Amino acid sequence: MENNRAGRPKSCRRVKEMPKVRCFKPQGIPGIKLEEMVLSVDEMESLRLADLEGLYQSEAARRMDVSRQTFGRIIDSAHRKVADAIIHGKSIVIEGGVVMKREEQVHNAKPGCVCQHCGHEESHRSGLPCRDMICPECGHHMIRKGGCGTGQEDI
C-alpha cells in the first residue's frame, strides 16, 4: 500500500552504482502476463548494504546519506516488495528514486552531463540543462554529473 501524501520532497540518496540489470522475472511466464513490482534504485541499494554486505542500519544509513530511521523505512519497503514479487510471481523492475552515485559527490570537479542508463559523459553546454540533453549512445535523457537523478529510464 503506497502512501501518496504531500510533504517534503525526498532527499538525495547516495548509491554505489546504478543497477546493471533492471528487470527480473519468473521463469516460464511471458512478460506480457506478469504484474510488475517496481523497486527503486535506493531500495536496491538498501538491500545491497544491509543484506549483501551485512551492515548495521546506522552504517548503511551513513553510506546512503540518510537518517537511520529513513534507512529503516527504505529497507522495510524493499523487503516487502521483493517478498510480494517472489510469493505472487511478479517481475521486479528496478528504476526510480532520487539518487546520486557516491563517488560523484567527491570527484565532480568539472561540470558535465552523464547518462544514468549507459554512463556516457558529455561536457555541459551553457544554456542547455543536462536533463534536456539526449545521450548519443543510447537515446536516454542525461542528468547533471554529481547532481541528484531520478534513477528512471526515460522511455
From Swiss-Prot:
What Pfam families has UniProt attached to this entry?
Answer: DUF134
Q: Sorted alphabetically, which HAMAP family does this protein's record hold? A: UPF0251
Which family, according to the similarity comment? Answer: Belongs to the UPF0251 family.
What protein does this entry describe?
UPF0251 protein Paes_1249
> What is the organism of origin for this protein?
Prosthecochloris aestuarii (strain DSM 271 / SK 413)
